[in-house]
């Protein structure tokens, strides 16, 4: 049996991000950038809704056991994502409203939590 805490393969992570991105595009958001990496954190998806910038964390689980993807986000990950988003906005001279969304993908089912944290 696979331990739910094992890192998922990059291929599965990319598949989850593809599902999330396509879902958000269907909801009317605009894609800006993907997999923005800094030494202290990564942003899975950068999207926009009008003038609002949206930083999206995608959590993927092939099975919804052990609490599923929605419960896989730690306080440390939230802190790193916030720091990465702040740095991203500074680097790109963005002075706008932003929010942090979570997309949880469990066995192909998508849950979108706007303003998740």
From Swiss-Prot:
It comes from the Bacteria. GO terms for molecular function: nucleic acid binding. PANTHER family: UPF0102 PROTEIN YRAN. Belongs to the UPF0102 family. This is UPF0102 protein Ssed_4252. It comes from Shewanella sediminis (strain HAW-EB3).
